[in-house]
Structure formats: C-alpha cells, structure tokens
Amino acid sequence: MIIRTEHLVKTYKQKGGDRKRVVNDVSVSLTQGEVVGLLGPNGAGKTTTFYMVVGLVRPDEGRVFLDDEDITRLPMYKRARRGIGYLAQESSVFRRLSVADNIKLVMEQNGFSSAQIKARTQVLTEELHLEKFLDKPGGVLSGGERRRAEIARALSTEPAFILLDEPFTGIDPVTIEELQGIIRNLASRGIGILITDHNVDATLSITDRNYILVDAQIIAEGPEQDIRENERVRKFYLGEGYRREGLRGEVPSSASD
C-alpha cells in the first residue's frame, strides 16, 4: 500500500484580510515498510502538510490517496479503519485508565473480540516491554513509558501506516534511542512510518527518505546524506555551520537493546 499526496495547497487568512499560502504544490509519498521524514524550519508548512495527510486539515487544492482511493475528504476515524494510524505530539493516553484498558478500549471500538484483545495485548506489551506497567494508570507513566503505551495502542488495530507527530519531543536521549529502535523494527515488519519532528539528528538517522519544506514548498528530497550535503538545505534549514560526524550509525532493533 502507498499513501501519496498530489499538489497540496493550503492558505490561511491573515490579519488585514490578506491570505497566506502556507503549503504550495506539495506532493509526498509513503510506502509500507518505509520510514519517511517531513522536516523544515518553523513556519515552513510541514505541520500543515502532515495534518492534511492525517486528516486534521483539509487542503484547498490537491488530493490525498491511499493506493488509488481518494481519501482527501475522509475523516480521521475512517482513515484509521483503512489502516492509517496517528500518534499526536500531545499525550493521548487516558490518564485514569490502565495501560491494558487503554489498549482494550481502542480494540473494542474497532470490533475486536475479547479473545483477540487479550492475545493482542499480551503480544504488544511484551514487544514494547510494558508488562510491568499493564495495571498502572496512564497518568503515572514517564515520558518514554507513555510513548511506548501510545505506540502499543496504535499498533493494536494492526495499521499499515503510523503517522508520528513530534515523537522525540520531551524524552531523554536514552529513550529517543529506544524509540528509534522501535520505529525501525516496525518498518522491518512492513509498517510505513511518517515522522515530522524538530529533532533533526534523531529523525534523519532512522529515515529512508526525507522531504525538506521551506517557505511552503519542498526544496529537497532524499536519504540522510543527500539532505545533509544539500546546499539549499544547509542555507535555509540546517545552517552553514551544521556538522554531524558519522552519518548513519547502528540503531537498536528493539527497545530492549
């Protein structure tokens, strides 16, 4: 399966009545098993583009497709039923519910049986090392534990894609490394991952491809090294003095590594 956008355009009304084009003719794609970054400076249009893929924002022009189906006007919950999962930047765990009940609630809403819920919960909590947190309410989890619980809940419905909004925000370097390993592991199992994040190094080090937006338009596309060496990207996004030695290193394959 593939998610793709064609020539997305979005404008917003400014003070004084003028309209500003915040996304201008943006086309991106994401296939299953691929990790793709959507990056750029503040105000570049990356978040608006991301939200149009998610279904939170409707484009003024252009279309969003899942394979050959036009899903541009499809609400988020219907996109979810077609296999497009979404993790928001803000905490989305139900704070008073246990980790197990967080997973159970989502699966019940999607028509899974009690037996399926029990089996799937066991698999996910073992995979994401959440066994000892099963009965703990979401409100007492640390940032990294919460992220893993949110991922477990998103995976419970067996999506083909997961769209991650600022997944590396608010967590420490060790937890970032664990999360990177989880993301690469999901991709190796055929799940497509789209990431938008301000943490450039954490994102570029695990992506297969990246789109860089500046002033509402894509100025570059490619793998990590191409992005880091692109003169326009360095000028308008990374900065001329940007340095990072040893481009792609080994990323743990799971949270236990």
Q: Where are these predicted regions, by residue range?
A:
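Conserved catalytic motifs of ABC-family nucleotide-binding domains
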Residues: 158
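Conserved ABC ATPase signature
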Residues: 137-141, 145
